[in-house]
Amino acid sequence: MNDALKTYLTGIGWFLLSLVSSSANDVMSKYLGTRLHSFEVAFFRFFFSSIVLLPFVFYHGKNTLKTSRPFVHILRGLLLFFGMTSWTYGLTIAPVTTATVVSFSIPLFTLILAVFFLNENIIWQRWVVTVVGFIGLVVTLKPHTEDFNPEILYFVLAAISFAMLDIINKKFVIKESMISMLFYSAIVTAVVSLPVASQYWLTPSGFELALLFVLGSSGSLILFFLLKAFSMVDATATAPYRYLELVISAIAAYFIFSEFPDKSTLHGAVIIIPATLFIIYSEKKAMSRKHESQ
C-alpha cells in the first residue's frame, strides 16, 4: 500500500468515525428526549460541552477566548438552542432514519441562504438540483398522506437553523478561534436553555446524566474527527461517504428502537443524495475556478 492510499484510507476512517458519532448523538437524543424535555436535554448537552471545553481553553490560554464579535456568538448560541431543541423533539416523534435523511437537506437550505447573506451567485443548474432535492424532502416527510404528523416539520426548522449556522461559520469562523466559537456557543445555549428547561424540569437519573455528558462531549469529538479527516483528504473526497450515515443510523435504530426506514424515507434519500452531491461537487469546482482566476 503506497503512502497516498494509506493517507486517503486513514482520512476516510476518521470521517467514518464522525458519522458513527453523529448517529450515536441522534440515538442518545431520541432516548433522552422520551424521558426529559428537549429544553432540558439542550441545557445539559451544552452545559457539559462547555465543561469539556474548559481544559482546551486553559491549554491554549485565555487569549483564545478574545473576541471582537460577541453578537456572533450570541446568535450562534440562539440558533443552536432553537435547532437542537427542535431536532431533539422531532426525534421523539419520528424515526432516526427520517432525521438522517432530513439532515442531508441542510446543504439545500445553505445554498438558498448563501444567496441572501453571502451574496453568492448560483448557476441555474444548481437551482434545478435544489428544487429536485426539496422534492426528495417532501417525499420523505409525506405531507400528502393521511398519517402526516405536522410536528415532523420541527426537523425542517432545525435544518434551517443549522444551515444558518453554516452561513455564519463561513463568514466568521476564519476570523475567530475554533475554541472560542465552540465555547461561547455552548455557554450561550446553556444559559438560554436553563430558564425554559426549569419549567419542565425532571431530575435525570445517573444513567441519563452519563448519557447527557457523553452527548455534550461528542460535539467536540465529532469536530476532532472531521479536522483529522480533512487534514488528510479533501472535503469533497469524503462527500460520497457522508451518506453512509443513513446505513449506520438504520442499523442503530433497528437494534435499539426496533425502527426500520419506511419506503418514503428511502425514496426521499434516493432523490436528495444525488442532488446534494451535485451541489457539493459544483461548489468545489466554483471555488477552484475562483482560486485559479486570482
UniProtKB/Swiss-Prot annotation:
Membrane spanning stretches: 4-24, 39-59, 74-91, 98-118, 121-141, 148-168, 177-197, 207-227, 237-257, 260-280
Membrane topology: Multi-pass membrane protein
Top-rank lineage group of the source organism: Bacteria
Record flagged with keyword Nucleus: no
InterPro entries given in the database record: EamA_dom (IPR000620)
Subcellular localization(s) per the UniProt record: Cell inner membrane
GO annotation terms (biological process): amino acid transport
Lineage: Bacteria, Pseudomonadati, Pseudomonadota, Alphaproteobacteria, Rickettsiales
Family from the record: Belongs to the drug/metabolite transporter (DMT) superfamily. 10 TMS drug/metabolite exporter (DME) (TC 2.A.7.3) family.
GO cellular component: plasma membrane
Domain (EamA) ranges: 21-141, 160-280
Protein name: S-adenosylmethionine uptake transporter
Keywords, alphabetical: Amino-acid transport, Cell inner membrane, Cell membrane, Membrane, Repeat, Transmembrane, Transmembrane helix, Transport
Main function: Transports S-adenosylmethionine.
Keyword Membrane on entry: yes
